[in-house]
A protein has these predicted regions:
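Structured-RNA-binding interfaces characteristic of tRNA pseudouridine synthases
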Residues: 1-248
Length: 248
């Protein structure tokens, strides 16, 4: 049978989700835990591949296994006891045999957190930026993103990508006492896309670029035309949605 694992992780201590030959990844740690508990190799296929230092409040991965009578009900508890403190399992859901954690996802939502003050407790969970930002201009620019579908200008260079088309359905900045949060939802994202978008919008907020410039940047399809890529530690994958009919 096929199952979806729902889980969270702090990405600080990991070189991203995907297994790496000479570095520790979230996938490696979770697969090792599953193999130890279930006494057989359990390959995981996740909804996406977060980069080094990126966090996930909600992530899904699918796997196949024929559970014994009492194994399934205990697995979430056992995994949480076995895994390190920075990975937490939330649920185990039975899905249809063809359900795919990556390809069946309808949407993904990311948040990027910027702090306007120094904090010794949260420096691995946000990007520190003390300059004042023009949020009104940044939100005008965020709306521009939803007018386009080709985001090659925000894609990491020299990556094997079949299509640069993404449908962004929400993009907005909010302000709090602690700083700024950017929330963006799309059906899919390119590698490094959110961090490049945030860096570009920050440059607009600092008046280094204009909202009108953003149209030209997107139309150029040139990564060097866009802004800088902000650091990974402020980025969180926060929500993934699936068709209800996948779940049994």
């Amino acid at each position: 049978m096929r199952f979806f694992l729902e889980f969270s992780y702090a990405g600080t201590n990991y070189h991203g989700w995907q297994r790496q030959p000479n570095a520790v990844s979230v996938q490696e740690v979770m697969e090792q835990a599953l193999e130890t508990l279930l006494k057989t190799p359990i390959p995981l296929t996740a909804a996406g591949r977060t980069d080094t230092g990126v966090h996930a409040r909600q992530m899904f991965a699918h796997f196949e296994h024929d559970f014994r009578y009492d194994e399934k009900t205990k697995l979430v508890h056992q995994l949480n006891q076995f895994l390190p403190h920075d990975i937490v399992i939330h649920s185990l859901k039975t899905v249809t045999q063809t359900a795919h954690a990556r390809f069946d996802a309808l949407s993904r939502t990311y948040e990027y957190h910027i702090s306007n003050r120094k904090s010794p407790f949260e420096n691995e969970l946000h990007y520190e930026l003390r300059q004042k930002l023009d949020i009104e201009a940044m939100n005008k620019a965020a709306k521009v993103l939803m007018e386009y579908e080709d985001f090659e200008c925000f894609s990491k260079s020299k990556t094997d990508v079949k299509t640069y088309l993404c449908q962004i359905t929400h993009a907005q900045w909010t302000v709090s006492e602690k700083g700024y949060t950017f929330t963006i939802t799309a059906n899919r994202f390119l590698r490094n896309m959110v961090r490049a978008i945030v860096g570009t919008l920050i440059e607009i907020g600092l008046k280094k670029k204009t909202v009108e410039d953003l149209h030209q940047i997107i139309q150029s399809k040139n990564r060097s035309s866009a802004g800088y890529s902000v650091p990974a530690q402020g980025l969180f994958l926060t929500k993934i949605t699936y068709p209800k009919e996948l779940f049994i």
